[in-house]
Amino acid sequence: MLKRKAIASIKNWVNTKNKKCLVVQGARQTGKTYIIERFAEDNYEELLEINFKQMVSAVDIFSGDLTVDNMVMAMRFRFPEKKILPGKTLIFLDEIQECQEAITSLKFWAIDNRYDVIVSGSLLGIDYKRASSYPVGYVDYLRMYGIDFEEFLWGMGISEDMIGNLCGYLESKTVIPEAIHSQMMNYYRQYIAIGGMPEAVQKYVDTKDFREVDKIQRSLLLGYQYDIAHYATAEEKVKAEKCYLSLAKQLLDKENHKFQYKEVEHGGRAQKYFSSIEWLLRADMVHLSKLVTDVRFDLDDYARDDFFRAYTTDLSLLMAMKDFSLKQHIVENTLEGNSKGGIYEYAITDALYKKGYQLYFYKNETTKREIDAVSYTHLTLPTNSL
């Protein structure tokens, strides 16, 4: 089983006084359901899990009065084998986008405050807009991402103490011994080729077989395409899929990594496709890095909405859009040309995205110098040399 940092975040939520319902957000197949189930197993006497895709008729639990007592009574009749006890039972509503009344009910669970309720689902940014009454102010949020490089190292057997020792070299500005550096670069190239989707990482941990990983990556990509076909409006289905499948070409096949609509379709224009990018963004299928015209606070004040780079939400999905040989070149360190620059730009951007940073990039029109990833932290960034 892969160790995930999100477990600690859920523990913090549980220990919060007067906690609200927890909404676990994130892209498809990033491990949301697995993490919640594992957490419940270790921290509660009972887990009551309702997956609204699997249990279609379970929506009836939320069809009447949405008082907590009524909902709990309906759950007890539906699941008589389950003990539903305050503080001892975790109520987990999965694929909640399939039941809009369950979304509305979160307000009443939070006000009542006797039961611990966690919800999750795919494309919540799309479906929450259809809820009859969204529970603003009554939910806490946890965003889950694919596995990051540190979590990948844990999966490969590298302990936290070993990683701490490595960080010690960096913090003291000491040269890392070549044997360690070389092995870490091998791990990093493996991680780039595999990506952070838990199923792909677990397959590599178990088999060390990139061909098996490739099968999973392509299956995951098909799942994303299915979601576009299933959830997008009739007007957006084809356009959103075209935009999504163009991302590898946008990032790896040309020197300029700006998202260009002409790469989606010959003669393509923003007027036709920008709404599809917005849909993919709300659906947690892409994240964007916008051009900023100046590197100063607040970066968003200098951002251009019409000039951006678009990335898949995990490296696994980018790998699935390209031939298997790309993984071979990455692992063997034989990448050249635009693909090499694009892959490593993407890898750094992916790492920052998984830390929760809003990303931008900068280009000085006078010197033509570029910074591929710009974000704001408590650190002061020198700008006089740009």
Predicted regions and their residues:
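Hydrophobic anchor at the beta1->P-loop junction of P-loop NTPases
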Residues: V24
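Hydrophobic positions on the alpha1 helix immediately C-terminal to the Walker A/P-loop
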Residues: I35
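Accessory nucleic acid-recognition modules appended to NTPase machines
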Residues: D206, E212-I371
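Conserved lysine of the Walker
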Residues: K32
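Conserved small/polar residues in nucleotide/adenosyl-binding loops
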Residues: T377-T383
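Short glycine-rich substrate-engagement loop in P-loop NTPases that contacts/grips substrate
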Residues: S57-E81
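N-terminal pre-Walker A segment at the start of P-loop NTPase domains
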Residues: M1-K11
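Interdomain motor-coupling "hinge/lid" segment immediately C-terminal to the ATP-binding subdomain
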Residues: R130-K249
